[in-house]
Structure formats: structure tokens, C-alpha cells
Amino acid sequence: MRTLCAFLFAMAVAQAETFQDPNATKYYTEHKEFFHFATPADLPKDLTWQDGSGQKEFADPRALRGGILRQFTPSTPPTLRRVGPNANNGFRGELYDNNDFGLLSSHPNSDEPIPALATSWAMSADGMTAYFKLDPHAKFTDGQPITADDYFFAFYFYRSPWINAEWYVDYYTREWGGITKFDNYTIAVKAPRKRPMQLENLGELRPIPRNFFKDFGPTYEKTYNDRFQPTTGPYYVTKEGFQREKSVTLTRVKDWWGDHRKYYRYRYNPDTIEFTVIREIDSAYESLLAGEIDFMPIRMPRYWYGTNEKKAYLDGYVTKVQFFNDIPRPPYGLYINTQRPLLNDRNIRIGLQHATDFQRVIEGFYRGDYERLNQFSEGLGKYTDPTIRARLFSPELARAAFAKAGFTQTGPDGILKNTAGERLSFRLTFDTSDRRKYLATLVESAHRCGLEYRPETLEHTTMYRKVMEKNHDIAFWAWSVSGRLPALWESHHGDNAVDKLADGRKVPKRQTNNITGIDDPELSALIDKFRAATEEPEMIKLSLQMQRRIHDNADFIPGFRVPGYRIAHWGWVKFPEGFDVRSAEDPQSYGLFWLVPSERDKDLKDFRAGVVRGPPKTIIEDRWRTE
């Protein structure tokens, strides 16, 4: 018995002793100005600890655990890596962004801080340092404990040139002032400067699983390309769960740490989430109506209105829901590659703005359900300039701008030419989603202005790679927006636009979020000032100036804004009262829904037998509506 006990004890100790990377340890020693080690006795005595317990719980205690959520994806992600080339893809939200936590979270209705991996926190008297007590029960999805060392490792990892991700190198270098370990479950994080929302910024720090990165080194991209990085969330992907171009399966962690915590219990309820590759949206929609998919977004009008004629809806099995949220609006529109010939001319870009009739797309294709986006940074409250308006479609103004760029002659096909005989013609790239169906509208409207848009539709992953390599002319795109402060360094700073060669030449910088390639010293200087600002009035002033400069540069053609989301779901998918929370981008953002598998079996049997379940049902939930 003693031998068995000793063995079990040794196993427990071995599991607790997570791998320590000697390179990381050396890095901490070489950067003593940033990495600090102390004892609990060194904690300031005047700290006022908070735990965020006064906020209202938002998940539904009626939620049931279990079942398989059946979803679709147009393609599998090009990589399972969290960072590095091709990692910032459309599937990242399911794998990581919605499946991981920092020290703190924001309450999705009030925006107030609530605990996440930290159970309590305190701010220093000067407002520059936040202290956090970590949840000793929290673990990564691979079962490894989350300790102070994983937060230290995050800085080593994200600053490493091996990840080939300059945004992270910059962010984890200049947006943090230092980190201190008092013990395994107590840390302090220092800010680089005073700034609004200091606690929220410092509370965003997320740990990196150092045990998983035993092989971290120069071959990072290849070594970890098809390996799921453990997160602090409730789901993980096994080796068998990633079948390239076939499916991705997320499996729920048994006894996840969040199941025992206020704000996290009653959430993320399915045991399994299966994403099957269905390339065509029409095919996915038919799978929904057949009960092979549990719910799906139906933002496109032909699905939203067309569902009214479908048997699954008419017989009361499928419910339509329109949920209005209150979040910063993703900038849907056309991104002009200013590093390409002719497109580096601002007059050409202004002409493109007037030659692109998004209002016609909104009124026709979207039946007026969407609204015109006016600029790149909308929905940021006082940080958004409400006076900036999108340039209106006007053949006269478009031709006037093109004339300033030297395009004054009209060819026999109606397309403008310059004196060198160059035609005013650009490749317009869309993905193969339903949006491609309004390409003809944009092409026809442009032709009226003497402009040729040459339409190109690519499978999602192929398009993503093309745009990130800066091989496009003009592409329809949108970036997700996290937080309520403008973050323009990655999308508009010259640092992310070009690489400067030894001979002085500039070439487009690949794999950055500056997909317009805009390299404007004045705008870059404003962005630098904003990032260094410490007082809110100055930050607001700079924010408005940045937005005006982006508007003047005309590298982005605002498309439309979507004031929420629309889905259709079967009756075995249950939602809480109010349906979702203010900050939700879609039902999986906060994971408040649950499944009743027994109802699925009965509903499908009755549906196929022609049994009418009830009257058609449409829910409009607009308590958070802002527009």
C-alpha cells in the first residue's frame, strides 16, 4: 500500500511540475527590467481587493449539459496554429477567440470587469499596476495547471521571432510594462503608461501553455501547424478531430474549471461541436432544413425571407430569430491595395469610392435590411467621428476624380483610358459566399463611371491567402472588432505596409492586417501618438483625426453595417430569456444555448412523417438595438 501511495504521489507531483523552457528562463534573466520575482510578503499592504461578484449572472440555470451540436464550415482552417502565417483566419473564433480567457472578462451586458482566470484583483494607488490572485483550480484543456509561469511564458512566446507575427511582437513589447510573480497563483502586471481602462487592458493578459511548447523553436510554423494549442476554455481539438477539408470537431473538457464558477457555469453546454465542410451556402441551408444542422446564420434576405415558405418553418419546427446587439461594427467593404499600380494614386481611389454603389446593393440585394457603413471605425461611441460620411455613388464625381489621374479618354467598350493607353481596370475579389451574387451590381455600376471591375471569386481559404500575401487589387473583406477603442496600428500603420530593403526600395509586407498597404507618414504619426496617449480627451481627439485621415486617404470603401445577427434554429436548441447578451456577435460568442437530444429524435421523426408541430414562429429581440 505504501508503494502504491508513493507512486500515486510521485505521479501527482510529476503532473504538477510543468515543463520549464531553459530558453525562456534565460530570457527572463536577460530582461530583469521586465520580469520580476518576489514573495507574498512583498505585496503592498494598502491594496483593496475586488472580485466582481456584484454583477448579474447572465447564463440560464435551466441549461442542460450534453449533446452534439451540428454545424458547417465552408472550409477547414489552413492551420491550427494560433499565431503566425495564415493563423488569423475565419475559423479562429471557434478554435481560440471564443474558447479562451484572460485574467478578467467584461460583463457582456454592463461592460464591467468580472473575474476569469483571476478570482480577485486590486489596482495600485498610482493606477499603473494591477494585482491578480489566480484561480488554483483553472487548467488548460490538456489538463495542465495554469500558474504564474504561464503568464511569464506568454511574453517570451509572443516576443519571439520564431512565431513570425510582428503584431504580437509589437503588442507584447510596447503595451506592457512588466510582470511580477509573488507565488504560483499571485501576479502583478504593470502598464507602460497611464491610459483609460487600465484595469481592463491589463486584465486581457492570457497565459500560454508552456508544457505544450516543449518543442518551441525556429521550426514553430511547421512543428505546430496541425496541432491545436491548449486553451483555458471548455473545448479542444484532438488529432483525429481535425480532418483537413472534411471536418473539425471540438470536444468538451470533462469537469471544466468554469463549470464551478459564477459567470461561466451553465454555458458552453454541448459535449461535442461538429463542423462539417459544406462549401456551398445553398447546400448548408438545405442541410439546415433537413435537420442535419441544428442552427445557422441566415443573414442573406433570400434565406431570411425565403424560410417563410419552407415546410420546416411552416410546420413549426424551425424558428427564425433576429437579434440586435450593441457592438463596434465590423468594417465590411472594399479594401484597395495601394501598393498596386494606379491604385497608389489617391485620385483613382476617390474615383473608386464614387463608382461603387453599395447603397444599391443594400436596397436591392439586402432589401434595405442593412445600413450603409460610413467609415472604418464605427460603433466606438465618443471615439467615433459621426460627421464622416461615406462618399455617395456619382458617375460625375467618379469621372472627375479619374480625370485628375489622367483618365480622360473613353475606349470603344466605355472604359476610360489615359494617354498611355492604360485602361481603368482592376480585379475585384470576393469569396464564394452568397455575397458574390451582387458582384454584377458593382460591376455594372462601375461601368457607368468608365471603370472596369474584373470579378474574381475564390474559395474562402484561397482568398484569405491571396489577400494576406497582398496579391489582390481590391477585395471585399471585414475585420472583427474587439474592444471599444480604435486599434489602427495593425490595419493602417506604415510598419505593417512595407518592408524596406537594403537598397532603399520598398516592397509590400506580407502576412499583416494592413491589407490596403497604406503607408502614410501622417497617419502613422497619429497612430503612434494615440498609442502613447495617457488621457482620454487627447485620445478622443487623436481618434477623430485618424478617422478623418483614413477617410481622406480613401483606401477603404465603406460597405454596410449589420445591426445584429439572424439565425434559424430547430426546436431542440434552447435559448435563455432575452435570447442572448448585448455583446454577442452570434450564439456561440458566449455559449448560452443548450440542446435537448431527445427532442431532436422526436422532432425529426414527426417532421418526416408530416406532423405539424405548431404555427410558424419568428422572434425579434431588439432590447439592445442602437441604430
Regions found by a protein language model. Name each.
Residues T119-N164, A188-K190, A284-S287, L342-N344:
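Aromatic- and charge-enriched surface segment that lines or borders ligand/interaction sites
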Residues N88, E94-F101, S105-E112, G203-R267, ...:
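Gly/Pro-rich hinge or "lid" segments in bacterial periplasmic/extracellular proteins
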Residues T18-T25, G52-S53, G241-V248, Y332, ...:
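Detector for C-terminal structural segments
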Residues D135, T223-D226, W256-N308, V443-H460:
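Ligand-site clamp/hinge motif
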Residues H36-E57, G66-A125, Y156, P230:
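N-terminal lobe/hinge region of extracytoplasmic solute-binding protein
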Residues P161, A165, I179, T238-T249, ...:
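Extracellular/periplasmic solute-recognition and catalytic clefts
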Residues R70, T147-A154, N184-K190, P234, ...:
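Alpha-helical secondary-structure segments
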Residues L64, Y168-G217, T223-N225, P234-G241:
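Surface-exposed binding/hinge segments that line
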